C-alpha cells in the first residue's frame, strides 16, 4: 500500500508538495471519483488514477533496474560533492527514485553498472555467498602468463594477508596484454590486487556482464536503458 500523494509524485515527477496541492484542489480522481485526501492508501499495483481527467500514462513500477554504460571519470555513488555520479547521469529521467549502484566500479573504470532502488536484489548480487559472476575486459601493462592464470584459478593472497577467492583469467584476442577476467565473488579492488601479486599493473578495466546479463553494446558511454523482463529475471535467479 502507498499514500496517494507519494504515488502521484512517483508517477508524474511532481514533488510531494505539488502532488498534495493537486489532490486538495480536486484535480485527482481515484477509481473514477475525486479524492482530496493526500494520505489515502492505494494498492499501487492496481490503482486507477486520473489527473485533470486523464488517466496516468504507463504502468506503475515498484522498482526500476537500469543498465548504464559507465564512462571514465564518473564515480559509482548516489551522490558526491565533487564528481559526477552514475546516478547523476540518469537523474533527469528518474527524478523521484532513490537510485543507487548495485556494485561499484572505480572512477577510471568503465562498463556495466546496474542502478536500482531494489535493495533486496542489490543485496543478492553483492552478497559473497550468492556467487554472482561478473566478467571484465582488462588490459595489463605486461602479457598474461600461465603463472597468473594458475594463480587466479587457485586464488591468491596479496601482501595484506586477505585471501582472494579463485577467479578466471583468460586471453581475450590476439593481444597478450588483453585479458577476460571472471569473478565469482567480488571484494574491493580484487582484480588489481590479484594481478598485483604478479607485479602486473591494470591499465584499463571494463565490466562486460553481471550474473549472465551482458552490457548492451549499442549503449555509448554514458547511455543507459532499463533491463528487459528477461534480463531482470535472469539476475533474480
Regions found by a protein language model. Give the residues of each.
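Basic, flexible Lys/Arg- and Gly-enriched helix-loop patches that mediate nucleic-acid binding at interfaces
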Residues: 2-237
Amino acid at each position: 500500500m502507498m499514500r496517494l500523494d507519494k504515488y502521484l509524485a512517483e508517477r508524474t515527477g511532481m514533488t510531494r508538495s505539488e502532488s498534495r496541492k493537486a489532490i486538495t484542489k480536486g484535480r485527482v480522481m481515484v477509481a473514477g471519483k475525486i479524492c482530496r485526501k493526500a494520505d489515502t492508501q492505494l494498492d499501487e499495483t492496481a490503482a486507477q488514477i486520473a489527473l485533470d481527467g486523464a488517466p496516468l500514462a504507463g504502468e506503475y513500477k515498484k522498482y526500476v533496474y537500469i543498465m548504464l554504460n559507465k564512462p571514465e571519470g564518473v564515480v559509482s555513488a548516489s551522490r558526491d560533492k565533487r564528481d559526477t555520479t552514475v546516478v547523476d547521469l540518469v537523474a533527469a529521467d528518474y527524478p523521484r527514485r532513490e537510485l543507487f549502484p548495485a556494485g561499484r566500479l572505480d572512477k577510471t573504470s568503465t562498463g556495466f553498472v546496474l542502478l536500482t532502488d531494489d535493495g533486496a536484489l542489490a543485496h543478492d548480487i553483492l552478497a559473497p555467498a550468492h556467487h554472482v559472476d561478473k566478467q571484465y575486459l582488462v588490459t595489463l601493462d605486461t602479457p598474461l602468463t600461465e603463472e597468473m592464470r594458475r594463480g587466479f584459478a587457485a586464488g591468491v593472497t596479496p601482501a595484506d594477508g586477505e585471501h582472494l577467492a579463485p577467479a578466471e583469467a583468460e586471453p581475450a584476442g590476439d593481444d597478450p596484454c588483453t585479458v577476460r577476467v571472471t569473478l565469482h565473488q567480488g571484494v574491493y579492488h580484487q582484480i588489481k590486487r590479484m594481478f598485483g601479486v604478479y607485479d602486473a599493473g591494470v591499465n584499463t578495466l571494463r565490466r562486460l556482464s553481471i550474473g549472465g546479463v551482458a552490457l548492451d553494446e549499442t549503449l555509448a558511454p554514458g547511455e543507459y536503458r532499463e533491463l528487459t523482463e528477461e534480463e531482470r529475471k535472469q539476475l533474480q535467479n
